[in-house]
Amino acid sequence: MSIQTELTRITNAKAAIKTAIEGKGVTVPEATLLDGMASLIESIEAGGGATEPYIEEVVDGNGDITNATLHGYTIIRSYAFYMCSKLALASLSSGITSIGNYAFYNCSKLALASLPSGLTSIRNYAFYNCSELALTSLPSGITSIGDNAFYMCSKLALTSLPSGLTSIRNNAFYTCLGLDSLTFEGKPKSISSSAFKGCANITTINVPWAPGAVANAPWGAINATINYNFTGAW
């Protein structure tokens, strides 16, 4: 290989690296040498100037994730923190709109104080067996709650379900023993016959529709009395 060919190859490589770095939102001065780009790459890895979504994770000595911060994400992908039993996340970034299947499956130390206000969808098994999850409310924009979404979340302390909710799937709140009285603020299109299965402490469910308007009552909450408060709006 000639010297000229080698110089051309190096020049092209430098140009490609420069383009890649600048694509992440980090400016590369024209006079920067090839070996001087290392610090700029480190800046990207640390999140500095990055425009792509990224996650900062805290791990313990065994390599288990104990905390995480999500930057720039709108969706938490399926299995994102699957079986992270030491994850003690206290909050999620405000831009999250959907939580995927099995996203926090068996995250037994997860203690979120609230969910992002823009959240619309909680998918299947999203918070399965998150036994420390003690939410007292759900975002007003929630439209669907998937199969086993809050399965055995025994500290869940919801008192109402938002008006925009259209679907509650199978075993969505299975054995959520912290639930005792629930008020529906709107009328879902469908509620599974097992949505509240095992919720032995639910004694009252208040709904703004007439008897029979939503099938499968009492939706698995066998100890509940349903108060129908139909006003003619449905």
List each model region and its residues:
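Surface-exposed receptor/substrate recognition regions of extracellular proteins
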Residues: 1-63, 75, 181, 204-205
